[in-house]
Curated annotation (Swiss-Prot):
Similarity-based family: Belongs to the cystatin family. Phytocystatin subfamily.
ATP-binding among keywords: no
Domain of life: Eukaryota
Localization annotation: Secreted
Organism: Oryza sativa subsp. japonica (Rice)
Gene Ontology process terms (BP): defense response
Lineage: Eukaryota, Viridiplantae, Streptophyta, Embryophyta, Tracheophyta
One annotated Gene Ontology cellular component of this protein: extracellular region
Residue spans crossing the bilayer: none
Record-given protein name: Putative cysteine proteinase inhibitor 9
Length: 114
C-alpha cells in the first residue's frame, strides 16, 4: 500500500510539473516593443506604479522587450523597460506585467530588474 501511494504521489507531482511548464513561459510570444500600443501600455504602467511616487516620478525612456499572452479573452503584456527618476539620478530597469481586457487595464506587477 505504501509503495503504491508513493508511486501515485510521484505521478501526480510529475503531471503537475508538466502542466506548470506547459502553461509557463512558453505561452508568451515576443512582439514589437516599438509598436504604438505597446508603448501606450508601457506609459500607462509607469504612470500607474507606486514606484513613480516613491522615486519622485518615473519617466519612460525605452521599452527594451515586449511579450504578449492571450488567455481567456484577456491580453497580458510582459514588458522590460527602462525609466528614469527625477530623484534617483540614474536609469532604472523594470519588468511590468499588464492585464488588458477591452479598455480596462490592471497592473499585475512592476518589479525592478538588474
Amino acid at each position: 500500500m505504501r509503495t503504491s501511494s508513493l508511486v501515485l504521489f510521484a505521478a501526480v507531482a510529475v503531471f503537475g510539473a508538466a502542466c506548470t511548464a506547459a502553461a509557463g513561459d512558453e505561452s508568451w510570444k515576443t512582439i514589437d516593443a516599438n509598436d504604438r500600443h505597446v508603448q501606450d501600455v508601457a506609459l500607462w504602467a509607469v504612470a500607474e506604479t507606486d514606484w513613480a511616487s516613491a522615486t519622485g516620478g518615473l519617466t519612460l525612456n525605452t521599452v527594451d522587450g515586449a511579450e504578449k499572452r492571450f488567455e481567456a479573452g484577456v491580453n497580458y503584456y510582459r514588458l522590460t523597460l527602462e525609466a528614469s527618476s527625477r530623484v534617483v539620478a540614474k536609469y532604472l530597469r523594470f519588468q511590468a506585467v499588464v492585464y488588458e481586457e477591452g479598455d480596462e487595464h490592471k497592473l499585475v506587477s512592476f518589479v525592478p530588474i538588474h
